[in-house]
């Protein structure tokens, strides 16, 4: 009886300790007789504080593993985006030389009454939209931005009273349009992990047949233009009819020169991944204003225009891939930074709770020792 009173007195004098933990420690030190009961289970022997510490430790380990994955994906995307940009730049000399040849041939044929189907402008009644998306996720809002651009253009065409059809390129766009049967889709295509002339030719054949057969009067290309590693923007370009000067024109007829690129090199500085940028412009060959052709210029033009169409589509696919990889690299970089911040905050909470647990145990030992005196 005296022991229980003594125990109660010590518990009430230590408000910082819980009643359960204090009474257990003092009874064990003073060896007061208590009623024996069945031994507690292993789960019940773990205090809530210990369980909380274990949960925090498991969560910290999970965040560390996630950070390793995002760091690896960031480095892989950084290596791939460099190769994608190199593919765009390496294909530039062929494309620009082809443009110069087409422009010179077209200049010579200005005085002749020549009907070139791919450059013929006719009243627009139906428009084909080639929507280029990515094949994978984990790239921020890359796919959402281009799909929203396509939705806005479809709404605009409906407001103008024009018919439309969609040619979807990319798995993400395919799954999006498959879930919306009210949007007319002519064909579903895949861009591949590394676009080549074969994938571009599949798109070119489809839009070529639609335009030549006059099923559509205009073909617009919606893709994400690669500006830099931290910037890309969804754009709409008129694919058909082709511009006779080899320029890339938007839906309003404004044409821009696309011969300039931002070339970059991935380096490390102070242990971190950095980018060195420089403006790169491919030199184009100078042609004589007077060119002599063995074949009929019209035949040459008919043969080169489909090739030029293929090169434009291939460039759009390559730029879209570079934009996707850059967006993935940026998203994984942000995820790694967020994981690092979360790991620091969780470690701080874990250390505080662990310190509080150790302090409580020390106070219990000191209180028990004082009780024996």
From Swiss-Prot:
BP GO terms, sorted: ATP biosynthetic process; photosynthetic electron transport in photosystem II; proton motive force-driven ATP synthesis
Transit peptide location on this chain: 1-50
InterPro entries noted in UniProt: ATP_synth_F1_ATPase_gsu, ATP_synth_F1_gsu, ATP_synth_F1_gsu_CS
The keyword Phosphoprotein is annotated on this UniProt entry: yes
Conditions for induction: By light.
PANTHER family listed in its UniProt record: ATP SYNTHASE GAMMA CHAIN (PTHR11693), ATP SYNTHASE GAMMA CHAIN 1, CHLOROPLASTIC (PTHR11693:SF42)
Identification of the protein by name: ATP synthase gamma chain 1, chloroplastic
Lineage: Eukaryota, Viridiplantae, Streptophyta, Embryophyta, Tracheophyta
